[in-house]
């Protein structure tokens, strides 16, 4: 009995010696009896074990009586799926001048081993404001840095890879959704079982801004003196300086949305109040309007909006 073998190539994690781990068994398909009708070999009994060589061919030299049998893979290399198919074959009576018969199970076609494959899926969300994030692009890499694929999240913040061969990988963000900070972390995962699905939840921090508002005005700083025929004349001198005591309100000038599409502030809505000369709290990206609420003492309120 001889066979041919096909082993699916694993280009990401090659193993040229995979054939060395493969073992096949020959089993009886029915009870095998002696000339007296006594069962000598019960049905499904293992009769021989053999492997294949570097040409991916194998053969059994077991001296089997005329009967029905099947071939079954007992062991394959790590990273490949065991073929549990039973391949039937038979030895039948031949002319008396034929001493040995060679059969080829599976019609002489190669018996295949596929690589173990699994998947990785991601869910991407906004760590700052909540909500799913679309258009996050992640690369899938083997531990030696070879890119094995990529993922791009949809409007639900989701994507799933194509089949990945058994092995260790990591995810790394290539492009962050608009309005968020690129995540520099690597997220390792391992595919170890056939059709396994690894789920990874990922987040981005939204970009934010701060506003520093300073107020300048003229204050009396000195006086120039000059002699006149009527006495000393004083001319006030004014200098520009930063003024304290102003208070400002910051409004949304347009509807402001988070990167995940959540409405944070409607147009005209007050976001925060800040004192002049102080840095504002973190503000979401968007168009704002600054309006003076309280003028410094001794100055007229500035009613102009600053966009």
Placement of each model-derived feature along the sequence:
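Solvent-exposed loop/turn and edge beta-strand elements of beta-rich ligand-binding domains
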Residues: 1-307
